[in-house]
Structures are given as structure tokens and as C-alpha cells.
């Protein structure tokens, strides 16, 4: 350290540094020497100049606005034309009397229907009033499954005696019987016999045999049927 200070060059550099350091600070903080104005004053001057310029321009260039005349709306409204309302007289509708439909009683239909003629070769239709036994007479020409089964059973059980065939006997026997809902054959008889006794007995026997195949029904029927014996 002593050798560093004892050196002549080093001593001269220290002296110059010591002398010029205060001068440097003096020059640095001196405003008049550098002629430096702060930014705030510059900004204030610019702002004042801008305001003066704006005031001058605004005073010189004021547009003349045309005066507008405002008309107040009048409260008087135009009167609407009054329309005359004509009174419409109501038209009186004529009442038309509708004829009432006369409903005939149920018995009138049964009376007005004409009776159909039936041949002797077809079963006879008779309607009997219900009594204590409540029988109902029917004909086998009706399209009921019950009567079809009875007719089919009679045709299968039809007996044509050999002796009657040999003697060339032919004819028709009208038979009447009652078939109950308990599947019982009652009141079997001949209403109209043929000329030959063989054919009459054969007709009664045919009904007895066929009754074994008669179907059961919920009602009791009174049936009349002709049995025809004819040689082919």
C-alpha cells in the first residue's frame, strides 16, 4: 500500500480526482448552466397554448343555427262522421210442424205378415202359446244347426221295409213328437197316416231310432215332420 502511494503517477491521479469531483457535481446540479427546464413546465405551456388556440377557433367558427318554429299540436280533433244505425227488424221464422212418426206395436208386425203356404212334404211351422210345459213348434226348414242335426239323424235312421218294397208300397206319413231339453222323446204320434200300415209303423220306429242321435237343446221343441217313402 505504501509503495502504491509513494508512486508519483498514482499521486497525481488522486489529486486530479480530488479536484474535479466537486466540479462535476456542481455542473450536474446547475440548471442555469445546462438550460434544462423540467417537463412539467413544458407540458403546462403546451396545454395553455392549446386552450388559447381552441378558444380562438371556437369564437371565430360558431355556426349560425337557423331558428326553428315549433308548432304546438292543436287539441281539436276532427269529428268523425256519425253513421246512422238502421234498426234491423227480426224476421219471424215460420214454424213447420213435423209429422210425428207413429211406431206400430210389436204385435202389429206379426199380424200384418202373410202366412206362407207349406207343402205336405215339408215340415209344418206352428207357433203355440207357452203353457205350463212351454213347448215351441218349429219346422225343419229353418236354418238352425239344431234342426239340421235332427233332420240328418232321421234321414240316416229311415227304415223302408223289404215287404213294402216288394209290394211296391209308397206314400207319406206326417209324424209329430216332442223333444225335451232333457233329451227325452215324448208324444210321438202320427197326424196323417199313409194307406199302408207297414209304412206307418216304420215311420214311428224311425223316429225312435233317430232320437238317440238328437242333440240336446236348452228349450223343449214340438216338431212335425213328414216321412216320405218313394221307390226309386
Curated annotation (Swiss-Prot):
Residue spans, topological domain Cytoplasmic: 1-12
Predominant cellular place of this UniProt entry's protein: membrane
Annotated region described as Disordered, given as residue ranges: 59-82
Extent of Polar residues compositional bias: 59-77
Membrane topology according to the record: Single-pass membrane protein
GO biological process: protein transport; transmembrane transport
Pfam families: TonB_C
InterPro entries: TonB-dependent_transducer (IPR051045), TonB/TolA_C (IPR006260), TonB_C (IPR037682)
GO cellular component terms given for this protein: plasma membrane protein complex
NCBIfam families found in the cross-reference section: tonB_Cterm (TIGR01352)
Protein name: Protein TonB
Species of provenance: Campylobacter coli
Lineage, highest ranks first: Bacteria, Pseudomonadati, Campylobacterota, Epsilonproteobacteria, Campylobacterales
Gene expressing this chain: tonB
